[in-house]
Amino acid sequence: MSESKQQYLEELKQQLHYHAVRYYVEDNPEIPDAEYDRMMRELMAIEAEHPEWISVDSPSQRVGGVALDSFRQVTHEIPMLSLDNAFSDEELESFLKRAQDRMPSAHIDAFCCEPKLDGLAVSLLYENGVLVQAATRGDGTTGENITENVRTIASVPLKLQGEGWPSRIEVRGEVFMPKVGFEKLNDIARKKGEKVFVNPRNAAAGSLRQLDSKITATRPLAFYAYSVGVVEGISLSSSHYQRFLQLKQWGLPMCPETKLVNGLESVKAFYADILNRRDALPYEIDGVVIKIDDIVIQEKLGFVARAPRWAIAYKFPAQEELTLLNDVEFQVGRTGAITPVAKLEPVFVGGVTVSNATLHNADEIERLGVMVGDTVVIRRAGDVIPQIVSVVKERRKGDENPIVFPTSCPVCHSHVERIEGEAVTRCSGGLVCQAQRKEALKHFVSRKALDVDGLGDKVIEQLVDKEMVETPADLFTLSAGVLTVLERMGPKSAQNIVNALNVAKETTLARFLYSLGIREVGEATAANLARHFKTLEAIQTATHEQLIEVPDIGEVVARHITAFFAEEKNQRVVQALIEQGIVWPPVEELGSEIPQPLAGKVVVLTGTLTQLSRGDAKAALERLGAKVTGSVSKKTDIVFAGEAAGSKLTKAQELGVEIQTEQDLLALL
C-alpha cells in the first residue's frame, strides 16, 4: 500500500510539473487553476504524512514555472515567492493562528488586504529613480529579462516621481490586462480572422513575452505594485500598507481596492465585499491576498520553501472546473433553433452544482473539437449560463465519440436547415413541430407578452401533448370543464385560467406584436413598431423600406417582419386571435396623458433592483420614452445601477455616461 502511494506521489509530481510548464511557460493551461490547486494540496498532504518522501525536485519546494530560453535570464537577489492558499474561513483562521503561535508576544491585528489579480508577476528594478530592469518571476529564483516590453506599459513609470526614493529599489507587482482592453483585443482578432485569447491572463502573459516589443506596445496592459524586494539607500516604513502609499507618491500605481484593516472579522468582511463586487471590477481576480502589515513581524516569521508565512491568498470559489461530458441533447426553441446541450457529470462551480451547459451551435462544437466522453473545462461566472470553454484532449482514452449534429429535427423529424451566414441550425417544421409549438405558446402567454396568470409551462406542455391546442387562438376556446382533465387541475384552478385568458384579451398593440414571437422582435422593437405605425394593419402591410425607418430596426429585423406577415399560416393565426376578441386601445391614447421626460434617451439597466422587477422597470422606462438597451456604448445616455452592478457600470464610468441609482429611477417613475 505504501509503495503504491509513493508511486502515486511521483505521478502527481510529474503531472504538476507538466501543468506548471503549460501554465507558466507556454501560457496555455489545460486545466483550471482550481484543479491545479487541488493536485498541489494533495501532494503536500502526502508529503506531510511522509516527509521522508520529499525530494528537492518536488513542486512543493519551489514556486513553479521555468524561465524561457528566448529571453536573457535574470537572477532574483531576493526570491520571488508564491503564496499558500486558503479556501475557507477555517483555513484563513488556521493561517493566522500559526503566525500568532510562532510569535506569542506579538499582537498580530493589522492586515493589508488587496484583490489577487490574475496576471503575471514581475519585478521592476529602479536605480537612481530610473527603470533599469524588468523581469518575470520565472521559477522564483531565475526569471526572464523583459525590460523592453515592460517599458511599453503606460502605467509603469520609466522614472520615479517626487523625491526621497532609494538609490536602488526593486518593486514587485502584477502585469494584467483590464477586461475592456481584453474584449477589444479579441474583437480585433475576430475581425482579422485570427485566434482569440482564452482569458485576460493568457493575453497579458502572451503580450509580455513577445520578442518584438512593438507588438507588446499595441497591447492594453496595466501594472499594479504589491510589494518591495531589494532596497538600498534609505529605510522604508515598517508598515506594508504605508509602503504602498510611499510607492504611490513615487508614481507607482497600486490597486485602488487595497485596504488596511484590523482584526479577523474585518479581513472576512473585505473578502466578502470583493467577492460580491468581483464581476464589477475592471480586471479579473481569483481571490484576495491577506498580508500581516508589520514588516518586522514579516521578517521574523520568514518563509517556508515556496511561500511566506506572513501572507496568504484567500481564493474565491472556482469559476472553472473539470468534469466529464456524458452526452449531448439537442433542444428545439420556439423559432426552430436547434441548440446542443451538454449533459455533464455534476460539478460544483461558481457557487452552484452544474449538470448542463450550452454548446451553442455546430460551429462551436467544431471549434472546441469536443467529443462525448471528453474531460472538459466548464465555466460559470456570475449569472452567465454555464459553458464549455476547452477540452483536455490529453485525457482522452480512445473511446470518445464525435458529436453528430442532427440532419432532421429531434422532435418532429422535419428537415433541418441552416441559412447561409447564420450559425444557427433550425427545424423547418414550424408549428407542426411539437417543441416549437410548446415554446411559441409559452412565449405567447408569458408575462411580457399577453401575461396570462396561472398558465405555466407544465400546463402548456400538457395541452400540446394531449393535442388540445395547436395555435395561440386555441387557448381562448378552452373551457374550465376541458381543463380539468389535465393533471393536478381542479375546477377552481381551471376557472381561474379561463378568467385570466379573458382578462388577457385586453392588451396593447406592443404586447400583442411581441407575443407573436417574430424573430428578433423583442419588447423594445415591438414598442417602436407600435409607436411608429399606430395600427396592426399598417405594420402588416409595411414595406421593407418603411420598416427600416423605425428606430432599432435594421435590414435583418425588417426581413424577419415582412417574412412573418407574408406567411399565410401566420396571417391565419393573427386573424384567429382577433376573432377571439383580442383588442387594444388606439396607440395615440396610450401616451397622451403620460409625460415622456426620457424621450429619445438611450438607457441601460444593470445590477439587482430591489423595489421592482427588471421587466417592470424596462416597461416603465419605455412608457417614459426611453429606448432600453442591453449594453453600454458611447450612445448610452443614462445607466440605472442597482445593487452589485457589474461590468456595465464599470464601462459607463469609463465612458463618462450619467449614472443614476434605483432610488433615482423610482423618483422618476
UniProtKB/Swiss-Prot annotation:
The active site is at K116. GO terms for biological process: DNA repair; DNA replication. The keyword DNA damage applies. NAD(+) binds at D33, A34, E35, Y36, D37, S82, L83, E114, R137, E174, K291, K315. It catalyses: NAD(+) + (deoxyribonucleotide)n-3'-hydroxyl + 5'-phospho-(deoxyribonucleotide)m = (deoxyribonucleotide)n+m + AMP + beta-nicotinamide D-nucleotide. GO terms for cellular component: cytosol. Keywords: DNA damage, DNA repair, DNA replication, Ligase, Magnesium, Manganese, Metal-binding, NAD, Zinc. It comes from the Bacteria. GO terms for molecular function: DNA binding; DNA ligase (NAD+) activity; metal ion binding. Pfam families: BRCT (PF00533), DNA_ligase_aden (PF01653), DNA_ligase_OB (PF03120), DNA_ligase_ZBD (PF03119), HHH_2 (PF12826), HHH_5 (PF14520), Nlig-Ia (PF22745). Belongs to the NAD-dependent DNA ligase family. LigA subfamily. This is DNA ligase. It comes from Vibrio vulnificus (strain YJ016).
